[in-house]
């Protein structure tokens, strides 16, 4: 702590990102990265943008990222005026907390959810209230329909549980909260869920957030976007242009466009992850683990007779890293990224040895 710190900084409990260790021969299943590389079109687009001498890098990128907005609009059958883009979905979410979540009433989100939400509340002075998930870790939409609030936000599928809320439940929330923005954070929806973007033309209080880090294999480029009513998007643009007018660099823009346009590769990778997830779920169940239903690129699991922290430690000793959260209700669970078939086999072989 320094005497130069502001009171906001003194009061903050910062977000703790997933570990990015520099260990040789590591099987890294802790941060939900895609096990497959980006589309070959992404590599070609980056090379074309660089050219022979990378001279374009001396120039600022398009502050509006119009090419990317157009690609997102085409993909989701909306207008470009309904699309906002940012430096990863985390930046998009940060602007949402500043621009659209009311500060005169508490916002609401699940008690077990993406841990960046309370961090943003602390940073921007937003009051919040958490609502408990059901015993099966599902979200009960009725809980979000009978109380005043300054906004609603939740991941769908939820993180770190992987459980999906159907569109009719989201509509129930939207109808019950016409004067609050409902933010659906769909970082993992491409692995078996149905996007709520289909609802944005019917509800002016809906904002849907996506990332290209997971299903498009671009975690290293940091690209995210939001889709919603044009008035919501304008609010985000106003905050963005008061914070950083150039959030996406030239290479990120062309890489993201290429990734959005290669539908065949996208579908191939998503289907492969889903197939491996199903196999991993079956094998863990055979080993005695309880596995929550998942529509994400990870699974959330516990062993009824083995301590989760000890399991994570034993896996790490075998150069396999998974995520363990030291939080109430979930401290006996592990979140395991769906890796390649080979990585998941190494994981289950190790767990068989540890628990056998």
Curated annotation (Swiss-Prot):
Record keywords, A-Z: Amino-acid biosynthesis, Aminotransferase, Histidine biosynthesis, Pyridoxal phosphate, Transferase
Assigned EC number: 2.6.1.9
Reactions catalysed according to its record: L-histidinol phosphate + 2-oxoglutarate = 3-(imidazol-4-yl)-2-oxopropyl phosphate + L-glutamate
N6-(pyridoxal phosphate)lysine PTM positions: 214
Any Pfam family the entry gives: Aminotran_1_2
Enzyme class, UniProt record, top EC level: transferase
GO annotation terms (biological process): L-histidine biosynthetic process
Annotated metabolic or biological route of this protein: Amino-acid biosynthesis; L-histidine biosynthesis; L-histidine from 5-phospho-alpha-D-ribose 1-diphosphate: step 7/9
Cofactor(s) required for function per UniProt: pyridoxal 5'-phosphate
GO molecular function: histidinol-phosphate transaminase activity; pyridoxal phosphate binding
CDD domains from the UniProt entry: AAT_like (cd00609)
Family in the record: Belongs to the class-II pyridoxal-phosphate-dependent aminotransferase family. Histidinol-phosphate aminotransferase subfamily.
Subunit structure: Homodimer.
Name by which UniProt lists this protein: Histidinol-phosphate aminotransferase 2
Organism listed in the record: Dechloromonas aromatica (strain RCB)
């Amino acid at each position: 702590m320094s005497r130069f710190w502001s009171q906001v900084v003194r009061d903050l409990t910062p977000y703790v990102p997933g570990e990015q260790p520099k260990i040789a021969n590591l099987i890294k299943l802790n941060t939900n990265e895609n096990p497959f590389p980006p589309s070959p079109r992404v590599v070609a687009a980056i090379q074309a943008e660089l050219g022979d001498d990378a001279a374009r890098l001396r120039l600022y990128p398009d502050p509006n990222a119009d090419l990317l907005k157009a690609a997102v609009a085409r993909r989701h059958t909306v207008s470009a005026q309904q699309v906002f883009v940012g430096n990863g979905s985390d930046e998009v979410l940060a602007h949402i907390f500043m621009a659209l979540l009311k500060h005169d009433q508490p916002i609401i989100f699940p008690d077990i959810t993406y841990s960046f939400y309370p961090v943003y509340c602390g940073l921007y002075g937003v009051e919040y209230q958490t609502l408990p998930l059901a015993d099966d870790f599902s979200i009960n939409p009725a809980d979000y329909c009978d109380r005043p609030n300054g906004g609603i936000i939740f991941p769908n599928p939820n993180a770190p549980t992987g459980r999906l809320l159907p569109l009719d439940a989201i509509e129930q929330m939207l109808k019950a909260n016409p004067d609050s923005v409902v933010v659906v954070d769909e970082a993992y929806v491409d692995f078996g869920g149905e996007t709520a973007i289909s609802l944005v033309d019917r509800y002016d209080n809906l904002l849907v957030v996506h990332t290209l880090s997971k299903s498009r294999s671009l975690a290293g480029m940091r690209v995210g976007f939001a889709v919603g009513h044009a008035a919501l998007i304008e609010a985000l643009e106003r905050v963005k242009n008061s914070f950083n007018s150039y959030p996406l660099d030239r290479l990120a823009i062309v890489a993201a466009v290429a990734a959005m346009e290669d539908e065949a590769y996208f579908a191939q990778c998503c289907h492969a992850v889903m197939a491996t997830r199903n196999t991993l779920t079956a094998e863990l169940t055979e080993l005695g683990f309880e596995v929550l239903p998942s529509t994400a690129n990870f699974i959330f699991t516990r062993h009824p007779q083995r301590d989760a922290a000890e399991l994570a430690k034993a896996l790490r000793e075998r150069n396999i890293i998974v995520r363990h959260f030291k939080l109430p209700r979930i401290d006996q669970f592990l979140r395991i990224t769906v890796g390649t078939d080979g990585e998941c086999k190494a994981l289950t072989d190790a767990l068989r040895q540890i628990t056998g």
